[in-house]
Amino acid sequence: VAGSPLSGGSDPWHTSPSPPRASWTEHFKIDTGPVSYADSISPEFYELERDAIFRRTWLNVGRVEQLPRKGSYFTKELDAARASVVVVRGTDGEVRAFHNVCRHRGNKLVWDDYPREETKGTCRAFTCKYHAWRYDLEGKLTFVQQESEFFGIDTSKYGLMQVQTEVWEGFIFVNLDPENTTPLKTYLGKFAQGIDGYPFHKLTQVHKYRAEIGSNWKLFIDAFAEFYHAPILHAGQYESGEAAKIKKYGYEALSYDIDGPHSMVSSWGGIAPPKEKAMVKPIERVLRSGLFGPWDAPDIGMTTEELPPAINPTRNEVWGMDSFVFFPNFMLLIWRPNWVLTYHYWPTSYNTHIFEGTCYFVPPENGFQRLQQELAAVTFKEYGLQDGNTLEATQTMLESRTVDQFPLCDQEVLLRHLHNTTQSYVREYQQRNAPAPTS
């Protein structure tokens, strides 16, 4: 079993969720047999995912810091949901999202040089490039070019189509399904409840990277949901002696947990700072930073012991990081040295997706701290490149259909859960939309 259960107690967060004699997979009542990756190589299944998942679940599209003032906006391309949205802070200070489409002839409303590229800015109103229809920041149609030429048009009926929008701890979510009445906080479940109060608002130094990956979106989530591969694929990121030790002993998690469609893994973090400086590379010794972030944790207003209960749920002394997957495609990683990393996986086809990584730090107070953060950010980019390259090789061979059954170990329990969840959403959608039987 990966990790060791702690003693019991009434607090569900501060005890290991795994019983002493069971594997994690069996504990969560997940089948332990070989799995198929047919859901990752099928164009037909991807089309079902678009309607069953991405048009019906809460999707994280950004943070409130991207909208610092009234009139601030950004657009988000949601190819998997067949949509583009514009997210804006209104004159009343509220954050809203609208379908990015003009009500006149369906032109994309907000874009710059290239319609498929995302954009951002500040404005007093949105004006269509095609015929100059204008909308205020709350989506109301305020101007129609040559309005008298239309046949009794009621402009009050042609405002922008609003999208359900809610904010959790500064993260902006949208839901494209007008019939979905589940509040965001309810959907995010116990993990969000247990993270409430973490000072995300203090982490305003942002580093972003983006890549177009030639693999199914779920395969990249799989890569970051297990550490089984880390000692092998990423061996070059460690000093040779440390790499050999990690390869010998493996890299196991402290605990796993599942809540509905969502999941999390809690991990040790012994190299921030390392017990011995010989474990890390010279640049890491000089800058006191690396894979687990800057070694000198900034003040965020709470100690490690005071973190919200879902973070380091076993309260293990060697804890280093927790990784939460909020289904379908938002991964939130909270690190012991007081910084945060998010991953987003935006499908563009059954075998391609856009991967976004964003590092959030407390703003540096001097040049040295800025370099510490830069090293952490570029270190993660290197890890991402190694994973992305490998996943493109995986996708190619899965599509050969030479092998269709794959054994997974206990450390890969969250992979099973992700694919089971995806297939469950698709099955439910198919059943709900099946034609009624004829008499």
Regions found by a protein language model. Name each.
Residues G62-R69, D154-T155, G320-F324, T358:
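Short linear motifs in intrinsically disordered
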Residues T15-F45, Y114-Y130, M161-E169, G270-P309:
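N-terminal short leaders/motifs
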Residues Q66-P178, T182-Q193:
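Rieske [2Fe-2S] iron-sulfur-binding domain
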Residues A2-D113, T165-E166:
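N-terminal pre-ligand scaffold of iron-sulfur
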Residues R56-V61, P68-R69, V144-E149, F324-N329:
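Short Pro/Gly-enriched beta-strand edge/turn motifs at strand-loop
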Residues E94, E166-V167, F171-S439:
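C-terminal catalytic domain of Rieske-type non-heme iron oxygenases
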Residues E49, V101-C102, T127, F220, ...:
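Short hydrophobic core segments
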